[in-house]
């Protein structure tokens, strides 16, 4: 069998389905005849928006097609970009035939025509942005040496304090399992749960929609408070985080670090401190959060504090 994952979202789980042996085998044969359309699954584009389609063999039988057990298409690295993108569209065009498959992830990300439309639109935007994406792939994470953790006075809120910590992307990026199973909400709260944490899951109700009010309510039920609602010293360490929304589609979180910048972790990809243009993030309200009409994190929902009593799962 062949597992298909569209690498797309930052907060909610990515669209995923499983092809049976016949369909999966036919697809692999097609790919094997044109291997210049594939790339390694961990080296391509990893910003906000469409990041390619991951294909993963679920059995240990040696592949007669001599393909790796896990690889990607349409992630910015394939030698034949056009053919790689065309195949991505072809796979997504057929995804709704799997919408009745029983997978736990479908509760948060159904494989339906609405998600299909978002993916196809995001692929179109990806193709338009391909030159920018290929430049982005070459960017190296950079960070200054700074104190491990400091308490700062919030410049926007008299009498409020919070903690900033040193940017430490290797904590999230060095282990492939950790990187794949923790998302932007984990990064914002600074808690590695390995559950791809969702706002409200621990407190009993995830967001009813991908909107500022719904995701905000779910996160506050986990214990976050709005900025300027000062947290006491007993909540140390208190993080300053920011929430943005791709309306109706997805959410994303940022966390303030020492050094005057913000870090984030788009979905199962690497933690970093730069935006979709490769620019160091000094303000999540104005940084590049995507483009196009299908998956663009246009709505800024506000700043929040996350104290030590915030529990996520």
Q: Which residues fall in each region the model found?
A:
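Function-determining sites in protein domains
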Residues: 1-148
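Active-site or metal-binding loop neighborhoods of secreted/extracellular toxin and effector enzymes
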Residues: 103-144, 260-313
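...with weaker cross-activation on analogous glycine-rich loops/strands in unrelated enzymes
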Residues: 208-269
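Cysteine-nucleophile protease catalytic domains, especially the papain-like/related folds used
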Residues: 146-225
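Surface-exposed patches in mature extracellular/periplasmic domains of secreted proteins
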Residues: 38-46, 195-207, 226-236, 242
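Solvent-exposed, acidic/flexible segments
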Residues: 17-20, 24, 177-181, 208-212, ...
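Substrate-binding/catalytic groove segments of enzymes
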Residues: 37-38, 63, 195-198, 249-264, ...
């Amino acid at each position: 069998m062949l597992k298909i994952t569209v690498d797309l979202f930052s907060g909610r789980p990515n669209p995923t389905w499983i092809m049976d042996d016949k369909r999966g085998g036919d697809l692999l044969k097609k790919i094997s005849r044109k291997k210049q359309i594939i790339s390694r699954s961990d080296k391509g584009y990893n910003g906000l928006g469409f990041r390619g389609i991951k294909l993963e063999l679920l059995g240990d039988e040696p592949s007669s097609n001599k393909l790796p057990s896990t690889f990607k298409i349409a992630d910015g690295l394939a030698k034949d970009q056009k053919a790689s993108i065309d195949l991505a569209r072809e796979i997504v065009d057929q995804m709704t035939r799997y919408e009745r498959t029983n997978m736990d992830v479908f509760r948060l990300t159904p494989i339906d025509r609405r998600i299909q439309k978002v993916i196809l639109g995001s692929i179109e935007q990806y193709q338009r942005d391909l030159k920018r994406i290929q430049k982005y792939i070459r960017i190296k994470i950079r960070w200054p040496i700074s104190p491990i953790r400091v308490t700062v006075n919030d410049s926007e809120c008299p009498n409020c304090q919070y903690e900033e910590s040193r940017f430490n992307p290797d904590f999230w990026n060095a282990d492939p399992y950790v990187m794949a199973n923790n998302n932007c909400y984990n990064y914002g709260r600074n808690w590695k749960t390995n559950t791809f944490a969702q706002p409200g899951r621990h407190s009993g109700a995830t967001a009813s929609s991908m909107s500022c009010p719904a995701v905000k309510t779910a996160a506050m039920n986990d214990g976050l408070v709005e900025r300027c609602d000062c947290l006491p010293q007993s909540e140390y360490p208190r993080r300053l985080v920011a929430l943005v929304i791709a309306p109706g589609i997805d959410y994303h979180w940022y966390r303030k670090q020492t050094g005057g910048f913000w870090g984030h972790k788009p979905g199962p990809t690497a933690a970093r401190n730069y935006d979709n243009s490769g620019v160091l993030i000094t303000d999540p309200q104005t940084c590049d959060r995507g483009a196009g009409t299908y998956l663009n994190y246009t709505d800024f929902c506000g700043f929040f504090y996350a104290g030590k009593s915030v529990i996520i799962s």
